[in-house]
Amino acid sequence: GILPEDKPFQTKSIILNNVYEKESELGVSRIISGMNFANLDVFIDGEKITEQNVSDWKQSLNMKTAAFETSFTFKDKAKITYTIYALRNIQYAGYIDINILPLKNIKIKATGKISTPEEFLKPLSTFRILKDNEVTMPILQTVAKSKFGKHTIGTSATFVWHAINSGREEQRPHLTHDKVSDYENHLSFEKELKKNENYEFAWTGAECSTQDFEDPQTESERFVIFNLLTPRNDLIDQHKKLWDDLWQGDIIIEGDVQSQLDVRLALYHLYAFSRGDSNLSISPMGLSSQNYNGHIFWDTELWMFPPLLMLNQDIARSLVNYRSDRINKAKEKAINFGYKGAMFPWESDDTGEEATPAWALTGTFEHHITADVAIAFWNYYRVTQNKEWLITRGYPMLKEIADYWVSRSVLNADGSYSIKNVVGANEFAPNVDDNAFTNGSAITALKFAT
């Protein structure tokens, strides 16, 4: 997830989906904010472009094409537009497409940067020009360990020029490498531009980790090389085509423009934070920040899942499969607490173990999450009628959850059953008996299993 900033050529952070590291020595897991390859410094006639020396500032999100566009005028010298893409087709890569229209003859300098968080360990920052026969591939790269060494993260980046063959060294501008420090790795070029002649180029980067790759360093290089040597229109058109496909699942509201924008923004974020066939889920903040540690809560099953189930069943399947892929950890948790079946964590990460901080009673007592999972599973089958999925994933999950609730319930003297000592949907009311939401969702889960 690339989070833009309201400053020229700046982004706040890049969040790495499903990549976790401990937040502190005694803390729980937290989603990683990775190296930032999406910042540039651009100079015109020796002066750096900043928010203080531009006018006609405008930023907009094109939800249809998933493109974040910024435009402005730098003094009386140039009109500049750039567009940030978190590429849907190259899911580990981003692409910043830049257009400069000189209002007079000018000289530009563009510096692309890889900035490594200070908490990362032993960054190795390099610049190399790879070569295959006559094709040359300039690669700026940093490789480092995450905060406590759980993951190796590799980030690569390079410039792309649209009017030339970027793989030909004799055609592209001279590149200058500046390793400011182990944590700041820069690559620059300069170019003289003539009045009213558009100049177009891009900065593209990719970031990979050992969560997904044995060799994240080399994989990040491959993605960048692909972007370097693929014509821009082909690359961006494929990205747009995939977003066109996503928007086949739309909600149209007539006569209320603001409500239409609000609903589409919500859908945009659901689509941007998820992917069909990934078997990953969505945290409350998606990929916009490290809030909630990037963990998966009941928010997914109860609020995010229903619209996706109706509008994009490939993504909906990924969300439920995320849970079934972690059913063994849920079964272990049930055993550890003296129950049968599967008991899901209140906060889940890549492992499927409980990831809630120990001080939060929700992690120990908010058990309705297990029923919420069952409700989502049965609803997926009811809508899709996918019997193969029901046999391999759906019913095994419903049975394990039913077994859990049977073992979790306590028989009363009058023949009724109670579920005691829980945190319900109201997280500020801990250690209550027969919470309405918990009991109701458990009853629903048991009915769905029969």
Question: What do the PLM-derived regions correspond to, one by one?
Answer:
Residues 265-272, 322-329, 396-408, 444, ...:
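Alpha-helical scaffold segments in carbohydrate-active enzymes
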Residues 108, 211-218, 250-254, 310, ...:
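Inter-helical turn/loop segments and adjacent helix faces that build the functional surface
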Residues 233-385:
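Substrate-binding groove/exosite segments of carbohydrate-active enzymes
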Residues 115, 206-208, 309-310, 351, ...:
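Short, glycine-/Ser/Thr-/acidic-enriched flexible segments
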Residues 81-82, 111-112, 317-322, 335-336, ...:
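Beta-strand segments within the central parallel beta-sheet cores of soluble alpha/beta enzyme folds
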Residues 1-292:
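Acidic/polar, glycine-enriched structural segments that form the non-catalytic walls/loops
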Residues 288-296, 342-392, 400-450:
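The feature captures the catalytic groove of carbohydrate-active enzymes
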Residues 95-99, 139-152, 188, 283, ...:
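Short, hydrophobic/aromatic alpha-helical segments in well-folded domains
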